[in-house]
Amino acid sequence: MNILHSTLSTWRDRLAPVSRTSTFRNTGQITPEEFVLAGDYLVYKFPSWSWADASNPAKRVSYLPPGKQFLVTRGVPCHRRLNDNFAGDAGHDDELVRDMLSGGTGGVDDDGWLRTGGGQDSADRQENRIKDVRTVDESGNMGEREEEEDEIPDMEDEDDDEEAIIRDPASGTTQPTRTYNLYITYSNFYRTPRLYMSGYLSPSEPLPPHLMMEDVVGDYKDKTVTLEDFPWYDGNVKMASVHPCRHASVMKTLLDRADAALKLRREKLKQAQSDPSKAPSVGESGLEGLVDDIKALSLSDQQQHGSDKSGGDEWEVLQHDEEEQVAIRVDQYLVVFLKFIASVTPGIEHDFTMGV
């Protein structure tokens, strides 16, 4: 059954009409040309990623150039397994993370993303999370949030925290380190990137496919993440894959939030011109920090502008007309994509792939 599903998925991607019209800002989808642009940026900025070709010309897709069929990074560490205490009670009713901007409710699956830790105790956990929400006052200042030891970090709350993706295992619970090769392909049917991953127990010992699910959050196993044949290789190479059916809606939500955060930051900067005490702090946490980091990157403009930095010395600051400035450009798409994919496999150190 799984073989049939993989085959149908591959042919659906290859036979679907190819879109050449950019709808990036409105839908979260990208065209093949935009995928190549975003891939070029990822490779340029983070050299651990590289372009790769299909194993033979017959495996190539026509809408991507030879030599740029997919992106790959190798040897990404994974230091621990995810158990039920981490993932919650898999197998109960699924819950969706709704777009917090629109406050969507019930009914429509396509506008959300499976929330980790579903199950009979989800109401209690949700109540605890509600207590943890930080407010923003009229001046754009974020309220204080109490830190809890057992809280699973969220990318929006811990963007600059080195432990945002993975925390060190507790003493006495050391587990063998696995490594993963990560592959980013383009789904022509869904018009979004798609992630595949292949695990290894050692450099010469592949991880059996079913054991890869030990590194996937429980509620995503066999739902959002399934075992699929990698279409660009001969020999039916089985990998774990994050299904792209909701990638566009999640990316659209992140784009909208980033634009809202950028607008808020502009307002705070304007206020700072008359009152310096209201100036945004350097390295501000949350999605505003993500906006500050990502909007400073460009593949086409390699010249540093002055000594002003944002989000790290390796990210150049660009000059934009204020009216035309956007929080996240299409060439930065894959950086944000990898940040939300990390929520599916938090044990895999995705930030390791972004070392320069």
From Swiss-Prot:
Pfam families: Autophagy_act_C (PF03987)
Active site feature: 245 (glycyl thioester intermediate)
GO biological process: autophagosome assembly; autophagy of mitochondrion; glycophagy; piecemeal microautophagy of the nucleus; protein targeting to membrane; protein transport
Location of region: Handle region: 249-332
Entry keyword set: Autophagy, Cytoplasm, Protein transport, Transport, Ubl conjugation pathway
Family annotation (InterPro entries): Atg3/Atg10 (IPR007135)
Subcellular location: Cytoplasm
Biased composition (Basic and acidic residues): 122-137
UniProt feature, compositional bias: Acidic residues: 145-160
Domain of life: Eukaryota
MF terms (GO), sorted A to Z: Atg8-family ligase activity
Function description: E2 conjugating enzyme required for the cytoplasm to vacuole transport (Cvt) and autophagy. Required for selective autophagic degradation of the nucleus (nucleophagy) as well as for mitophagy which contributes to regulate mitochondrial quantity and quality by eliminating the mitochondria to a basal level to fulfill cellular energy requirements and preventing excess ROS production. Responsible for the E2-like covalent binding of phosphatidylethanolamine to the C-terminal Gly of atg8.
Swiss-Prot/TrEMBL domain comment: The N-terminal region is involved in phosphatidylethanolamine-binding and is required for atg8-PE conjugation.
Family note: Belongs to the ATG3 family.
Self-association and partners: Monomer. Interacts with atg8 through an intermediate thioester bond through the C-terminal Gly of atg8. Also interacts with the 40 amino acid C-terminal region of the E1-like atg7 enzyme. Also interacts with the atg12-atg5 conjugate.
Protein name per UniProt: Autophagy-related protein 3
The species this protein was found in: Aspergillus oryzae (strain ATCC 42149 / RIB 40) (Yellow koji mold)
